[in-house]
Each structure stands twice: as C-alpha cells, then as structure tokens.
C-alpha cells in the first residue's frame, strides 16, 4: 500500500515538473527579464513619503537650527554637556563660552 502511494506521488510530481518545463512564458515575461524592472515600475511599487519638499513643489524646506553648531561644541565638552542636562543648553553654553 505504501509503495503504491509513493509511486502515485512520484508520478504526479513528474507530471507537474514536465508541465512546467514545457510551458512558454507569457508576452510580458518574454519581452523583459523576469528579475529586472524599470525604474518607473519600481518607483510605483515602492512609494515612500518624502520628508522635505522643495519650496516650488508645495511645502517649504525646514530651516536648519542656528544653535546647532554651538550645541555640538557644548556636547564635545563633557562638563558643558553635563551642565546642559541639568540647566539647559543655552545657559550651560553661556556659562562656559559667553553669550549665545
């Protein structure tokens, strides 16, 4: 009984494999490589929301923080960085380096 079941499964597998080998690709698959798509088709599949748009496209680009260079200077000094955690960046920077 097991041998008959195994033989039937093998025959079914052979028919499936033979059917796939003889099949021809459709017109869309034969004209293009199956592994590659155009840039336009790829961008239609993966549409990411844009964070920053240019002004002429609708939304303005966010302005950079003018205090960011000073904040980085304060972060590089361990004492200023520690004090900034307690009393705030602007006050810590003022105490170490003068007016902001």
Curated annotation (Swiss-Prot):
This is Osteocalcin. Residues 1-23 form the signal peptide. Ca(2+) 3 binds at residues 75, 81. GO terms for biological process: bone development; bone mineralization; brain development; cell adhesion; cellular response to growth factor stimulus; cellular response to insulin stimulus; cellular response to vitamin D; cellular response to zinc ion starvation. The gene is BGLAP. Bone protein that constitutes 1-2% of the total bone protein, and which acts as a negative regulator of bone formation. Functions to limit bone formation without impairing bone resorption or mineralization. It binds strongly to apatite and calcium. Residues 52-98 form the Gla domain. Ca(2+) 1 binds at residue 68. One of its GO terms (molecular function) is hormone activity. GO terms for cellular component: cytoplasm; dendrite; endoplasmic reticulum lumen; extracellular region; extracellular space; Golgi lumen; perikaryon; vesicle. Residues 24-51 form a propeptide. The modification 4-carboxyglutamate is found at residues 68, 72, 75. Keywords: Biomineralization, Calcium, Cleavage on pair of basic residues, Disulfide bond, Gamma-carboxyglutamic acid, Hormone, Metal-binding, Secreted, Signal. Disulfide bonds join 74-80. Gamma-carboxyglutamate residues are formed by vitamin K dependent carboxylation by GGCX. These residues are essential for the binding of calcium. Decarboxylation promotes the hormone activity. The record marks 60 as: Not hydroxylated. SMART domains: GLA. Ca(2+) 2 binds at residues 72, 75. It comes from the Eukaryota. Its main location: secreted. It is found in: Secreted. Belongs to the osteocalcin/matrix Gla protein family.
């Amino acid at each position: 009984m097991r041998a008959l079941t195994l033989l039937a499964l093998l025959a079914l597998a052979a028919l499936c494999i033979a059917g796939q080998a003889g099949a021809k690709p459709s017109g869309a698959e034969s004209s293009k490589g199956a592994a590659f798509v155009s840039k336009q088709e790829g961008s239609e599949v993966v549409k990411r929301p844009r964070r920053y748009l240019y002004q002429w496209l609708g939304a303005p680009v966010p302005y950079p923080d003018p205090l960011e260079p000073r904040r980085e200077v304060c972060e590089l000094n361990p004492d200023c960085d520690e004090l900034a955690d307690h009393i705030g960046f602007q006050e810590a920077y003022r105490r170490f380096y003068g007016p902001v």
